[in-house]
A protein has these predicted regions:
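Generic low-polarity alpha-helical segments
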Residues: 11-13, 20, 123, 197, ...
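Short, Lys/Arg-enriched N-terminal segments with co-localized hydrophobic residues
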Residues: 8-32
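Short catalytic-loop micro-motif centered on adjacent basic/acidic residues
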Residues: 39-40, 94, 119, 145, ...
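Mixed-charge interfacial surface used for oligomerization/domain docking
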Residues: 35-36, 44-54, 58, 63, ...
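N-terminal glycine-rich anion-binding loop in soluble enzyme alpha/beta folds
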Residues: 37-97
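Class I S-adenosyl-L-methionine
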Residues: 70-139
Length: 316
């Protein structure tokens, strides 16, 4: 009787371990069979050159139309060029999406070399770039388009999440599914110091701009996880230094739903002193393993102008 009872207890344990070993063996086999993966993102992800190199991201630039010329974002035009042109001509650029043929030309060499390609784009509410990538994926096998539902380093968080999973050996299909879910957890917002660029771009009236300047109002632009739509969530009042501290406190203080591995401070051209104020405010309210400081590219810069700054992180 004693041996029989022990046998009954022992058998389920053996079965459990056998099933577990078989499961992980199968997963290991799946990972081993997975094709090598090339990670691609459009130029609006605003990752630093160091992070682009670390994650081996292949960047495909959006087009920037300024004056009578068309440029490649981040290649032959940068935010300071936009600011200089605006000061002289009071004209802002217009960005143009990457089309399907451009995507196909960009990814085909990687696919023909035997790779899968994960391509992450700016939010679909902000550009037709994602739709172009989706249409390209219908023409070829092995291309996995992901709508970041964001912009700037909110989008950059999504790229890094994909890069982490590529490094872990996951297959492309699984990465695409997991990362698409993460896009709903990215929290991105920016403080705008001056409404001049928003007014010039048709995003606020002259009256609103004048009132904001007189009252020293600084709007917080928040990015929705529904395609990356942007809207005003709160209007702060006071000097920029004071507003930035209050803004960081509003985003971080007392929260327990934030992933604390990394956070971005992303700006469109601002003083080192103000970056230091924001970094100190972050450290006051929450510990992050990494605080990345990056310069926003042409998209955010042409919308909001200089002295725009945001913190961007991921919720659990």
């Amino acid at each position: 009787m004693h041996l029989s009872t022990g046998y009954c207890i022992f058998c389920p344990l053996v079965l459990y371990y056998v099933v577990t070993l078989l499961y992980f063996a199968k997963r290991k086999e799946e990972f081993a069979m997975a094709k090598p993966i090339v990670l691609c993102a459009d130029s609006t992800c605003d990752l630093s050159p160091e992070l682009i190199e670390k994650y081996q991201v292949k960047i495909i630039p959006l087009h920037v139309n300024l004056g009578e010329n068309t440029y490649s974002d981040g290649v032959d035009i940068h935010p300071d060029d936009i600011y200089a042109h605006y000061r002289e001509h009071k004209e802002l650029p217009k960005t143009a999406a990457i089309n399907m043929d451009e995507f196909l030309a960009f990814v085909t060499p990687y696919l023909e070399a035997g790779n899968d390609v994960i391509c992450i784009t700016i939010g679909s509410a902000l550009s037709t770039t994602y739709n172009s990538c989706r249409l390209a994926a219908m023409e070829v096998e092995g291309l996995y388009p992901i709508d970041s539902n964001n912009l700037s380093t909110g989008f950059g968080h999504v790229v890094m999440a994909a890069g982490d999973r590529i490094a872990a050996g996951m297959p492309a299909e699984q990465i695409a599914a997991e990362v698409q879910e993460i896009t709903q957890k990215v929290e991105a917002s920016f403080i705008v110091d001056n409404l001049e660029f928003l007014h010039k771009g048709g995003r606020c009236s002259a009256v609103a701009m004048l009132g904001a300047n007189v009252l020293k109002l600084k709007p917080c632009i928040e990015v929705s996880n529904e395609g990356g739509k942007m809207g005003v969530s709160k209007k702060y009042r006071g000097t920029l230094d004071r507003v930035l501290e209050e803004y960081v406190a509003d985003r971080l203080a007392g929260r327990e739903d934030i992933v604390q591995d990394r956070i971005f401070i992303t700006h469109s051209g601002i003083s080192e002193e103000r970056i230091a104020i924001v970094k100190a405010a972050i450290e006051k309210h929450m510990h992050f393993d990494e605080i990345y400081i990056t310069r926003a590219g042409c998209t955010i810069s042409s919308h909001c102008g200089p002295n725009t700054l945001g913190i961007l992180f991921v919720r659990r």
